[in-house]
Each structure stands twice: as C-alpha cells, then as structure tokens.
C-alpha cells in the first residue's frame, strides 16, 4: 500500500503523512487491509504489516490501533518511541519530519505516532518480530528492545514477540562496527 507520507505521489502526498498528519499513514494501511479482507482476497490471519525505520511507526501503530486485523507484524530498526526519539543522537534532524516535544502541538503529534505508548494491557496483539542493528546511528536499538519487552509483558495470548539484535549491523545495509568506527 502506498500510504500517505511516502514520496510516491509528490510533496503534497508526503506532507499528508508527516507531523500531525502522521496518523494518515497507519489509517491508510488499515483501510487497505480492511478492503482486502472485505473483498475476500485474504483473512486477517494472513495480514502482516512490515516497516523499517520511520516505517516502524506505520507497522507499530497499525497493530496497536487494530491488532485484530493482523496475524503478525515485523518492525525493523523501527522508531517506536516517538516521544523519546528527539533525545537521541539523531533526534534533532527528525524534528522537521515528526515534530518536537517542546511544544504542545508537537508533543500531541508525537504521542499519537508513538507505538510504544499505545500498547495496552489485556489486548491480544499478533505475533511480532522486531529486528535491530546494535550499531544503528539513526534509530537507537533500545527502541526495539523497549517495545518487545512491553509487548511480552502485556500480551497474554500465545503469539510470540521476538527480538533479534545483530551486533554487527547498524541501520540496515551492513553497517558493521568497523564501518561505524
């Protein structure tokens, strides 16, 4: 699904899915999943959003908003705690895209997109795989660890939450420790 926020359809399309408009991204994905299920192309048990980096917001929030709609989720080097993201090494450059916690409107937008802050007790979440490179300079690996721990703590069904950390990788594409140093 080409959800709003991507660059596929130009700048207006991109702006329709950034900052306070970020909820459009996961609402578009949810609408696409509902359409495919309603038309009989698939069932929820076969649907699995996958997103990496900022796409972790898309995957994480689609599942925290509609866990019943998906059989699994994959979050790769995902930005999953948008509230704390600004405090990380790469946080300030992301303010233009996501907003800032230093003003009320920005904080509300970041809270809306923060998957970690929408994980609730008693909800049956689908199976989850979170992957992260330990040397990631863009999205700190603690985000995936924190999200995995939260899902494991609240998810009482038999669906597993798995975390894979690659100690020789960064933000994808082979950022080894040697390359970072």
Sequence positions of predicted segments:
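Active-site-proximal cap/loop segments of hydrolase catalytic domains
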Residues: 1-181
């Amino acid at each position: 699904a080409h959800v709003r926020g991507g660059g596929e359809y130009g700048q207006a399309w991109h702006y329709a899915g950034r900052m306070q408009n970020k909820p459009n991204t996961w609402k578009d994905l949810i609408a696409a999943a509902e359409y495919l299920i309603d038309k009989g192309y698939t069932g929820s048990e076969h649907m699995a959003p996958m997103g990496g980096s900022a796409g972790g917001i898309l995957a994480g929030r689609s599942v925290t908003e509609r866990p019943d709609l998906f059989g699994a989720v994959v979050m790769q080097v995902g930005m999953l705690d948008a509230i704390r993201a600004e405090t990380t090494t790469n946080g300030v450059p992301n303010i233009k895209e996501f907003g800032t916690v230093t003003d009320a409107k920005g904080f509300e937008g970041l809270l809306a997109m923060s998957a970690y802050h929408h994980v609730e007790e008693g909800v049956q979440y689908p199976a989850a795989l979170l992957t992260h490179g330990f040397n990631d300079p863009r999205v700190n690996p603690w985000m995936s660890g924190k999200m995995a721990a939260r899902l494991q703590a609240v998810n009482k069904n038999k669906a597993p939450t798995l975390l894979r950390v690659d100690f020789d990788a960064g933000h994808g594409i082979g950022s080894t420790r040697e390359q970072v140093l």
